[in-house]
């Protein structure tokens, strides 16, 4: 689902996806993420202190949402992951029957068996995630978003 692209190009793609998500009740109807099940994760920049919004694929685990810091199998973690480590209270926007639901959540990093179970669940739905792990020597972090409703 991701590939090597310059950072500015990804920023442009993210901005377009965020705009489409918000204008079409959480649906993505065009572009490279057409039809993808995404949420918007709002973090506070670890260095800048500015809000950052990233569209991310997700799965559910009970009441929680699960996102993966794959960065397409890159050798480095995505910036949003560093933001989560520095500031684990995040904002989430996700499609719901009545439109887009917004809530705050606490982000925690899954470890051990839980991490593997959640990663495997995402890879079962989106096989690209299995390929991402093969492309890198780093353990790709799995983040559990625990809603604060």
Predicted regions: what is each one?
Residues 36-70:
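Short beta-strand segments
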């Amino acid at each position: 689902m991701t590939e090597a692209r310059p950072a500015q190009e990804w920023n442009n793609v993210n901005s377009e996806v965020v705009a489409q998500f918000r204008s079409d009740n959480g649906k993505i109807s065009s572009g490279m993420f057409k039809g993808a099940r995404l949420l918007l994760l709002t973090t506070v920049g670890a260095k800048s202190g500015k809000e950052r919004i990233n569209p991310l694929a997700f799965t559910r685990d009970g009441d929680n949402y699960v996102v993966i810091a794959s960065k397409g199998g890159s050798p480095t973690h995505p910036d949003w992951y560093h933001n989560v480590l520095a500031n684990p209270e995040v904002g989430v926007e996700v499609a719901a029957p009545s439109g887009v639901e917004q809530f705050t959540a606490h982000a925690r990093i899954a470890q051990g068996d839980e991490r593997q179970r959640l990663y495997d669940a995402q890879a079962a739905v989106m096989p690209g995630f299995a390929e991402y792990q093969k492309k890198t020597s780093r353990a790709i972090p799995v983040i559990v978003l625990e809603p604060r409703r």
